[in-house]
């Protein structure tokens, strides 16, 4: 049985008497090397063979139907691409290589004295399908610390941006400028064989992930801390701890929150705008810097990465209108008035999920433990009790439950990060873990240029036998 097979089976067996055997087998199988690239080099040929055999046997098999509504409706529900690192189940929520968020919180290594999973461990899981050892996670931390320094032209660029340029515009531009450092772009121009593409994509991805906290912290300091220095990377600290230090936050609980935040926002299967964008642009053999920069331009859109800001704006308006302690009845009336005015309750509902987002749940658990009496958290908790029932009564929502954005902004505000325009940059730093892990596998498996067929409305009408008049 291959390791990836063991990894896929293990989560399903967590409640069985064989669970311990499979998890120990998974841990032992992954313990052979602390070098992530070496582990990948062992896994890739086996996965290439498995996918090749699958395509040969089932390549012509029909996997679904496409309706006119799907074509006009943003391709919702259309099975159209392969994305290995995570799968979103409408009832269960996200699974990272088969593992749920609670399972990741339990199984992934933590920092000394910490309780939240280290994002380095999640990245190892996303890339390999393996639950890493502490030694492997420490290797990733030190590897990213070693690769973190920014080239001088990117520092100069960031220092010369006007202060009215949005943080996400600065973030995307700086990532694009890092393209000057691309190992893949150089190797491709020198005629490297396509079987080696993944190796250079891996190197670029590791470099980029390592540098993102430095870029993000530099933007934060320039915009909100009078251009003060981000300081130096400490190779003895984990990725999140270095990030919070560079941002200027020393509260250990905030570092723990950042570890949780960067873990749970990392990936949400391949159809969302940022993941699909990186997949699409990468299919043109654009290097990881160009692919990820494009993804960040998608994330900056109000329908994708700005939702937690909208939640905070709505909560602040609610507080201003209703005051401090609010009765459930007044809250219920306010929600109904929001809906009757044609607006939505931000932070509730999801394009795919049909239950409470597990990313919301783990943030709620963090808040219950660390800030149970915070007025804004109490307001969020009260909404959780009331909003779903109101939405069910209204009868329009397919999913009346809260999503990840209903909670994240409140936690960041509590620890003093009140600059809402910056929140999407944090989202972007996290999302790199998932989309770049997938980008490595896309090149390893030889995925081709993405080129779907488009149709005009007249063409669709002709296809289905409808009159165009």
Curated annotation (Swiss-Prot):
Gene3D superfamilies, per this entry? Citrate Synthase, domain 1, Cytochrome P450-Terp, domain 2
Q: Which reaction does this enzyme catalyse, per its entry?
A: oxaloacetate + acetyl-CoA + H2O = citrate + CoA + H(+)
Its annotated pathway reads: Carbohydrate metabolism; tricarboxylic acid cycle; isocitrate from oxaloacetate: step 1/2
Q: What is its main location?
A: mitochondrion
Q: Identify the catalytic residues.
A: 304, 350, 405
Keywords for this protein = Mitochondrion, Transferase, Transit peptide, Tricarboxylic acid cycle
One of this protein's Pfam families, by short name? Citrate_synt
**Which positions bind oxaloacetate?**
359, 431, 451
Q: Which InterPro entries match?
A: Citrate_synth-like_lrg_a-sub, Citrate_synth-like_sm_a-sub, Citrate_synthase, Citrate_synthase_AS, Citrate_synthase_euk, Citrate_synthase_sf
> What would be one Gene Ontology cellular-component term for the protein?
mitochondrial matrix
User: What EC number(s) is this enzyme filed under?
Assistant: 2.3.3.1
The entry describes its oligomerization and partners as:
Homodimer.
Physiological role: Key enzyme of the Krebs tricarboxylic acid cycle which catalyzes the synthesis of citrate from acetyl coenzyme A and oxaloacetate.
This chain belongs to the protein called Citrate synthase, mitochondrial
Q: Which organism is it from?
A: Kajikia audax
